Amino acid sequence: MAQEKVFPMTETGKKKLEEELEYLKTVKRKEVVERIKVARSFGDLSENSEYDSAKEEQAFVEGRITTLDNMIRNAKIIEDDGANSDIVSLGKTVTFTELPDGEEESYTIVGSAEADPFEGKISNDSPIAKSLLGKQVGDEVTVQTPGGEMLVKIVKIS
């Protein structure tokens, strides 16, 4: 039997996924079933766009429930025990400057399940995180990005 994928995440990230799962199971699922019921009442299902739309949404919701359930079941909680606080690792926030112009950026490195670049949380599978993991303050690192290579210097890890 194949081993299931492990999803590294913070305790906060796991709680957010659990909340989303609960919402989908208790609220959204019922809303979609009601939409299907209403659409069925319109008659002929062969040309019923409301019915098709509701069925598509139901498939999406059920798929998301399955995905979230799997992620939560296979979550590996990242604990910040304070050890190696000078090394970039999962759960750490790393601040670096882009060389040579010195533009500063900060990201928290998290598991893919809770990545949200708009909130400054990047996946440990991202090119930037892969380049930074295991490095220390003062290290200069070449990062591969979709836009090409960039050289950065790590200035802070917290």
Swiss-Prot record:
BP-aspect Gene Ontology terms: DNA-templated transcription elongation; regulation of DNA-templated transcription elongation
Example of a GO MF term: DNA binding
Superkingdom to which the source organism belongs: Bacteria
InterPro entries, sorted: GreA/GreB_C_sf (IPR036953), TF_GreA/GreB_CS (IPR018151), Tscrpt_elong_fac_GreA (IPR006359), Tscrpt_elong_fac_GreA/B (IPR028624), Tscrpt_elong_fac_GreA/B_C (IPR001437), Tscrpt_elong_fac_GreA/B_fam (IPR023459), Tscrpt_elong_fac_GreA/B_N (IPR022691), Tscrpt_elong_fac_GreA/B_N_sf (IPR036805)
Record key words, sorted: DNA-binding, Transcription, Transcription regulation
Similarity field: Belongs to the GreA/GreB family.
Its job: Necessary for efficient RNA polymerase transcription elongation past template-encoded arresting sites. The arresting sites in DNA have the property of trapping a certain fraction of elongating RNA polymerases that pass through, resulting in locked ternary complexes. Cleavage of the nascent transcript by cleavage factors such as GreA or GreB allows the resumption of elongation from the new 3'terminus. GreA releases sequences of 2 to 3 nucleotides.
PANTHER family in alphabetical order: TRANSCRIPTION ELONGATION FACTOR GREA
Name of protein: Transcription elongation factor GreA
Lineage summary: Bacteria, Bacillati, Bacillota, Bacilli, Bacillales
Name of the gene this protein is made from: greA
